[in-house]
Amino acid sequence: MVEKGASDLHITTGSPPRLRIHGRLIPMTEYPPLTPADTKALCYSILTDRQKHKFEENSELDLSFGIKGVSRFRANIFMQRGAVAGAFRSIPFNIRTFEELGLPDIVKELAKKPRGLVLVTGPTGSGKTTTLTTIIDFINREREEHIITVEDPIEYLHPHKRCLVNQREVNADTASFKDALKYVLRQDPDIVLIGEMRDLETIQAALTVSETGHLTFATLHTNTAAQTINRIIDVFPPHQQEQIRVQLSFVLEGILSQQLLPNADNTGRVLALEILIPTPAIRNLIREDKIHQIYSAMQTGQERFGMQTMNQSLYDLYTKGLITYDIALGKSPLPDEFIKMVEKDLINTKRR
């Protein structure tokens, strides 16, 4: 898996193992289709007795583990058609830099904030954890503070550098995100990383931790900045939503909504990134429940504030030859707008 540069390995009955390479799922044809006995033996080979017992109770198990000199891995073991199956993701030991990920300088500025809420969003497999890991590593090298992470499971390991780093894993070091966040303020943190804002209690805790003067990072499975804001507010009952809009408008420092796309020659993947920086005008729009107007503010805030919409990011990658037109159009949240951007550029090119 690691030698072939695969991001994921899938093990299930009736198929040879399959590797995800640059987004495509490729069967390892040198192996025969796996039997139920094969998949159970392979998946159980990495489990402790305690983990085996928990899996047999729940039929689901999240975990992470490392192989010395090879890589760390995140795994999900599950049942399908009465047989054991597993999905494994490779987590490199080396943490990548902002430049290696293609993150703009404005993201580094978010890592320098003394307090507030920074959200990294996107679909599964879009690199949210990798982006957050790079941000946390930058803070770890640049600041002298206390970082607490709550993850399910722990993926990247952060050694103590200039910061003190405590990493807590759900179901190993704490019962749940909710329980960990209930006590986090008593642990004297400066920076808090929440692996995923899954429910009302976790979202409320993230807002409270941010509001009390801590820099807080979290992820959500949303595709755009505006959708992220709506998701946070809509989780709460109607009578609380006005209060949450006000609270969010004060604590929010940035939203990074990302996608990983195959590059133009299909030899790797590149990052497309929507960036929202809450200017005073955008904070007012959040408070006044005018979320639909935020997109226009982002379009005009690119040069001055470092913001960009997903279409602006896709267009930039396309004009640089990093992705194809078809990929850009297929991944655009507003394809008609993207087509007009390309047509406008063609007209301007002809006039020159």
Mark where each language-model region is.
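Short, flexible helix-loop junctions that flank or precede catalytic/ligand sites
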Residues: 1-352
